[in-house]
């Protein structure tokens, strides 16, 4: 699977797993479809999907070879609007991180657009398809309720120290650790609007599990420079890219 990511470390293998669409993601928790809708905050549970155009089968589109070749996703067929989910991942051994998320999303999900910044990652697609993708991202090893945050705005906190419960900082306090149950609850949607009832996100992963699943190189975990294969490949790409830019011949 070297085409997905180089390296012989566990971190490198975890990156390959996320980016390989044939790898079956481990399911770690159960979140209902209704709770996913609440977390996203784009429509009310049970509300019809708002549309931006008629269903494709009702549209009189001109003949196009590409349109005939490519099967549209369900939301495009129905005329759904485009919506998003955005994650923030703690630098303290979160399972995923922004660039890995984007690579993985583009390998795994059709009809979706991924955008990456240093501390956040967004995926946009048609609304009903987004809900399916979001459910998978929230229920599987992509997500830890303490070290991963669902944040549509005010995302800061990925590089800050964890609190006494091991939770990543969130200025809007969307995800709260319940000390009575030992579980994390989402009390606001990704935008920061308060929910009528909290959504149970499950127990935080323990430190050993996080260290085993993380895609983040750290000197107090697996150091990047110790993964010789990954370093050599990345240096080769950087050198050839630089040389090609200066002298394409």
UniProtKB/Swiss-Prot annotation:
Its cofactor is coenzyme F430. Its main location: cytoplasm. Keywords: Cytoplasm, Methanogenesis, Transferase. It catalyses: coenzyme B + methyl-coenzyme M = methane + coenzyme M-coenzyme B heterodisulfide. Pathway: One-carbon metabolism; methyl-coenzyme M reduction; methane from methyl-coenzyme M: step 1/1. It is an enzyme of class 2 (transferase). CDD domains: MCR_gamma. One of its GO terms (molecular function) is coenzyme-B sulfoethylthiotransferase activity. It is found in: Cytoplasm. Coenzyme M binds at residue 120. SUPFAM superfamilies: Methyl-coenzyme M reductase subunits. Its EC number is 2.8.4.1. Binds 2 coenzyme F430 non-covalently per MCR complex. Coenzyme F430 is a yellow nickel porphinoid. Methyl-coenzyme-M reductase is activated when the enzyme-bound coenzyme F430 is reduced to the Ni(I) oxidation state. GO terms for biological process: methanogenesis. GO terms for cellular component: cytoplasm. Component of the methyl-coenzyme M reductase (MCR) I that catalyzes the reductive cleavage of methyl-coenzyme M (CoM-S-CH3 or 2-(methylthio)ethanesulfonate) using coenzyme B (CoB or 7-mercaptoheptanoylthreonine phosphate) as reductant which results in the production of methane and the mixed heterodisulfide of CoB and CoM (CoM-S-S-CoB). This is the final step in methanogenesis. MCR is a hexamer of two alpha, two beta, and two gamma chains, forming a dimer of heterotrimers. Belongs to the methyl-coenzyme M reductase gamma subunit family. This is Methyl-coenzyme M reductase I subunit gamma. It comes from Methanothermobacter thermautotrophicus (strain ATCC 29096 / DSM 1053 / JCM 10044 / NBRC 100330 / Delta H). The lineage of its organism: Archaea, Methanobacteriati, Methanobacteriota, Methanomada group, Methanobacteria.
